[in-house]
Regions:
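Hydrophobic transmembrane helix segments
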Residues: 13-54
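Hydrophobic alpha-helical transmembrane segments of polytopic
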Residues: 7-14, 42-49, 73-80, 111
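Aromatic-anchored segments of alpha-helical transmembrane domains
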Residues: 14-24, 79-90
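Interfacial non-cytosolic loop connecting adjacent transmembrane helices
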Residues: 28-44, 85-110
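Alpha-helical membrane-associated segments of multi-pass integral membrane proteins
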Residues: 4-11, 95-129
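Membrane-interface helix-boundary signature
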Residues: 3-7, 11, 35, 39-42, ...
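Loop-to-transmembrane helix junctions at the membrane interface
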Residues: 56-83
Length: 133
């Protein structure tokens, strides 16, 4: 019964970290982000959290009891995390986060509120077999 708890904690951390990084990109720009904040060491933490969130999220799927839009958001969040893993693991393997420059700055303007909303949504997911938490 731990997979839903682990998913909830790691997914919230992933989305809050994504929110913080994208907001930082908006405020200081991609050049300073890569030079001062978003290093391969940060990517190690980010990639590990994503891997744990993806594994525990897929393991929790059969116990998901949330319905309607929240169920759709669960799928969206889980697929987003899962598909993002190769990008972030690659940064660790090649020891570079310079790929950030590939994305236009407005991308972060979209990602920032989306990641904050996803972090909140993850806290609302409910799973069979857990208490009223």
């Amino acid at each position: 019964m731990r997979a839903p708890f682990i998913y909830r904690v790691t997914a919230v951390c992933v989305f809050l970290m994504g929110f913080a990084l994208h907001l930082t990109n908006v405020v200081i720009g991609p050049d300073r982000l890569v030079a001062k904040v978003f290093s391969p060491r940060v990517e190690i933490v980010f990639a590990v959290m994503m891997i744990v969130a993806a594994i525990s999220g897929w393991m929790s799927l059969k116990r998901l009891s949330s319905r309607g839009l929240l169920r759709v958001v669960y799928w969206f969040a889980l697929i987003l995390i899962t598909l993002s893993i190769p990008i972030h693991v690659r940064s660790v393997v090649i020891w570079s986060t310079a790929w950030v420059h590939v994305f236009p700055k407005y991308y972060s303007h979209v990602e920032t509120p989306m990641f904050l909303a996803l972090a909140y949504a993850v806290t609302r997911f409910r799973f069979r077999g857990e208490g009223s938490t």
